[in-house]
Amino acid sequence: MAHSIWHEKIKSFLPEHYYGRINHFLDEAYASGLVYPPRENVFKALQVTPLEETKVLILGQDPYHGPKQAQGLSFSVPEEISAPPSLINILKELADDIGPRDHHDLSTWASQGVLLLNACLTVPAGQANGHAGLIWEPFTDAVIKVLNEKDSPVVFILWGAYARKKKAFITNPKHHIIESSHPSPLSSYRGFFGSKPFSRTNAILEKEGMTGVDWLK
């Protein structure tokens, strides 16, 4: 992970030498088989959205496990890749909430202060949750704890039971939580559709005197 403010803040919430354990895990994982995303993109979310600019967190579970899908940003895929089912539903809700967006690559959200973080940062090809419980959760929980310490408000968007459990780390009353069921086809009709997370996020940011996100960009 590139040295940054993120690096130092996250480190303070982890056991000693945990970064070394992560690097060892990555060396072994990428040497032993096909793993997504490409190794250079494992920490992309933290590289493209600096801590000081982060005002929204959208928490995913783990990267897409199909060829060329995962790019290090939760729910996002490269522009030339077909949208997976969860992203299709996210874009459908966005269209109903604010307006249509044709792009599958969510990098422009990340560049506006939306941290697109997965709880697990790697996945073996074809094995959803294949790296769950091995190394990543203490690290990404630490990211949430770092955000919780921010003096400026952050909107935490938590979709699904797994993400909603992370509310335990969000104790600072300055922050806001938007939660619903997950956008996956299995649960999207149980509260995700119609939840209007994008307009609600912007309403919160603007009420706090901050610039809203151009979700259609």
From Swiss-Prot:
Keyword vocabulary terms for this entry: Cytoplasm, DNA damage, DNA repair, Hydrolase
Places the protein is found: Cytoplasm
Record EC number: 3.2.2.27
Lineage start: Bacteria, Bacillati, Bacillota, Bacilli, Lactobacillales
PANTHER family reported for this sequence: URACIL-DNA GLYCOSYLASE (PTHR11264:SF0)
Coiled-coil region list: none
Role according to the record: Excises uracil residues from the DNA which can arise as a result of misincorporation of dUMP residues by DNA polymerase or due to deamination of cytosine.
Enzyme class: hydrolase
Protein's recorded name: Uracil-DNA glycosylase
SMART domains: UDG, UreE_C
GO MF annotations in UniProt: uracil DNA N-glycosylase activity
Family named by the database record: Belongs to the uracil-DNA glycosylase (UDG) superfamily. UNG family.
Native species: Streptococcus pyogenes serotype M49 (strain NZ131)
Pfam families for the chain: UDG
GO cellular component, as recorded: cytoplasm
Active-site residues, Swiss-Prot/TrEMBL: 62 (proton acceptor)
InterPro entries: UDG_fam1, Ura-DNA_Glyclase_AS, Uracil-DNA_glycosylase-like, Uracil-DNA_glycosylase-like_sf
GO biological process annotation, one example: base-excision repair, AP site formation via deaminated base removal
Catalytic activity: Hydrolyzes single-stranded DNA or mismatched double-stranded DNA and polynucleotides, releasing free uracil
